Amino acid sequence: DDITNALEADIALRGIGRKFQTPRVYDSLTTFENMELALPGSRQVRKFFRRSVRRDECDNILQILERVRLKDDRHTEAKHLSHGQRQWLAISMLILSSPKLLLVDEPAAGLTDLETELTAELLLELKDEHTIIVIEHDMDFVRQLDSKVTVLNEGRILAEGDMGELTANEEVIEAYLGR
């Protein structure tokens, strides 16, 4: 199905979670409050402020925050998190609703080397539970994911394979290195 013009809620209902290059988190809310807002069924802001979190929801949030290394920052406002931590918060907000497919745009953009490595580890952990499509220009990061890679050029598929195959592919070299 084409989701190009679909509403965000309809996309989520189809089991698709999207993380954009710039993390969509609420700066003035704590890490935990951002997660509360992402709970399925709490999309309306008024509902969020009036509802109490059930024990099982709280446990699930804490489990996910521990998994993404943010449990100790659960009371920290998002504006005080590093860029990498904000990326992890955005990813954790997505996985809270257990989507079948995660579309992750530029997860390594602007991260430190350590944050990049930890983000790759997180995505590798998640790939057993979700189908993940990563859009990324950092080839070292892509190499860490050790997955099938599809190279696009001018809107069309240029090549597919593992990183070893693609770095030796003449079409890829021509398109991206201009030889």
Language model regions located:
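Conserved ABC nucleotide-binding domain
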Residues: 4-6, 64-82
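Catalytic Walker B motif of ABC-type/P-loop ATPase nucleotide-binding domains
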Residues: 102-106
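Helical segment within the ABC ATPase nucleotide-binding domain
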Residues: 116-128
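ABC ATPase NBD Q-loop/coupling interface
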Residues: 1-14, 53, 79
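Conserved ABC ATPase "signature" region
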Residues: 49-73, 121
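A short, surface-exposed alpha-helical micro-motif characterized by mixed small hydrophobic
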Residues: 142-144
